[in-house]
C-alpha cells in the first residue's frame, strides 16, 4: 500500500489513505460535528486564522478544518492519483 499525501493549504499535509470525506462547513450537521470534535479534543484547525472553507473527515474520527475549498483539495487528490497511476502503468 502506497502512502499518498495531500496538501490542504499553508504547508499542511494529510494522508489520503485515511481520508473519508471532504465537505463544506456551511450545513448545521457539519457545524455540530465540528463542535463535537472540538469538545472531544479531536479537532485540528489548519486554517491559520482564515475562514474555514473545507472540513476534512478522517477515519480516526479526527476533523480537520482547512482554508482551501473542498473542490481544490479533491482536485489535488485526483491529480496525485493520476500521477501514481501513470507511474505504475
Curated annotation (Swiss-Prot):
InterPro entries: RemA-like. This is Putative regulatory protein BLi01788/BL02292. It comes from the Bacteria. Belongs to the RemA family. It comes from Bacillus licheniformis (strain ATCC 14580 / DSM 13 / JCM 2505 / CCUG 7422 / NBRC 12200 / NCIMB 9375 / NCTC 10341 / NRRL NRS-1264 / Gibson 46).
Amino acid at each position: 500500500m502506497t502512502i499518498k499525501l495531500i496538501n490542504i493549504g499553508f504547508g499542511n499535509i494529510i494522508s489520503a489513505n485515511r481520508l473519508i470525506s471532504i465537505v463544506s462547513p456551511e450545513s448545521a450537521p457539519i457545524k455540530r460535528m465540528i463542535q463535537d470534535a472540538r469538545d472531544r479534543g479531536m479537532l485540528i484547525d489548519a486554517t491559520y486564522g482564515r475562514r474555514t472553507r473545507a472540513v476534512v473527515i478522517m477515519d480516526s474520527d479526527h476533523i480537520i478544518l482547512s482554508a482551501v475549498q473542498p473542490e481544490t483539495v479533491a482536485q489535488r487528490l485526483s491529480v496525485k492519483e493520476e500521477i501514481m497511476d501513470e507511474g505504475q502503468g
